[in-house]
Amino acid sequence: FRIYVFDTKNIPDLLTKFLRVRKEFIGPNQPRNLLPMSKELEMATTICSNSFKTFKAGSYYLPENSNDFQLCWVSGMINTYPMLALNNEKERNRVSAELDFVVNKLQGKSGYFYGGITANGELRPEKMYPDFPALQAMVRKNSDALLWLIKHFMLLKAQGYSSMIKPEWENAAKKLAAAFSKTWHQHGEFGQYIVPETGEIAVFNSTAGAIAPAGLAIAADYFKHPEWLQVAKDAANYYYKKDVVMQGLTGGHSGDISMDADADSGLGFLESLMALYYYTNDKTWLQKAEVQAALCASWTLSYDAVFPASSQIGKLQSKMAGAVWASIQNKHAAPGICTASGDYLFKLYRATGNQLYADLIRDIQHAHAEAVNIPPHHITTNNLVGSSMERIQPSDAEGEESVGNYINTRNSWTETNGMLMSLELPGIYVQTDKGQFYTFDHILVSLLNKKQKSVVLRLTNATAYDATVSIFAETSAEAKNPIPVAAFVHWPTVNIPSGETVKVQVNNRGKIKLLK
């Protein structure tokens, strides 16, 4: 082992130091190119498409291994986003039906949403405080809901289907943003649990509202309501000082762990800080985001753990650097972020040029791919083809027999974050004027030629699957400008059959051309 001794002024300095040295002892990890992101998207969207059902309550993609519906957090009305991104009429109409269902069945009088509903149409309570009998909902779920509702609207606009955005959906998003604003002005925080009927806070404290500033910032821009942006800034400053600067941890984001420290809230708060940078162009948010990214890295495996040779992960020789520890209670890691692509880490890399942020989200994506069930040669969940589940267990916290072994089940949220990473992260990011690139997808890339206005890249697909790889190219000057929410819609792609190599010219306008 190695001990680092250094002077530090505060917790943010400690966190940023940790980010710089977290891989120094063992050196860089070696992620495997196993599963192209396009293949993962294909398999996971097939699972999700087959899960669309109609019940007495309404029509929706199942977010759990039951027929009941749970809003956001573990994928409800988040798994709709990659299905909408497929840009076909069948899934577009299904997504529309689910948004109708959510807006009509789950929104309370206050503007906040209830956390779930049974297939038979009965509202589902959260894990409630017994001395507070009113039906409550997680603030975290409502924070997700505001962000993802408007992301759906922006994706429809980017696809050319703005006419499909219903006034009822927009009104629901407005009411939710207004509810958050009202709560903030009344209490100076968002709390952890709220009462959708009245808007009353049932349980105070925690960082359960970590994603709320992102939702409010995007809502302020979409609806041209600047007051919500001010609330977003005030709330983000509050949480940053209270939880990041003063404690070096965030919590309260998961429904099963009370207010324990967790990764979800930390990563969700990074989403908010990057959203505020996007909508204000104020670099103080970027500075806060760098500290927050360092905190997020502390929840992520920095090395390829050695698993028992007889375990499932050991037999597969999986490289698990990038697995994300969910919380201090769960005592295991998971494939990916609950529930997001983590594209804010890519955006932070793009804005700062610090490759450590790109390495972090690349590790997360590649560890996720290792957990995907791909029979007959890469079996993890013993479940559906393309499925994954939430346990990557490098410790004996659940018993020695659990180390390196999966559980025979699947989780929609892990499959959903895999879909989101496949969409919202570019396969290759290129700065043409510098001749620099970074590869997120599971291919090998080398620079063959650099000219003033273009580069030529060699792309090799050594995996067992054909790959469709997105390329996001720009100049270093353009990288100073934030990119829109649904930017991936406009990224060109190149097809690379399994085992083959192609050459592609990428110009400074982001256009690509296959070369012989």
Predicted regions: what is each one?
Residues 5, 76-92, 144-165, 211-226, ...:
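Well-ordered alpha-helical scaffold segments within catalytic/enzyme domains
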Residues 49-71, 113-139, 187-211, 248-272, ...:
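Carbohydrate-binding/catalytic loop surfaces
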Residues 126-133, 154-226, 240-241, 278, ...:
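Active-site lining segments of carbohydrate-active enzymes
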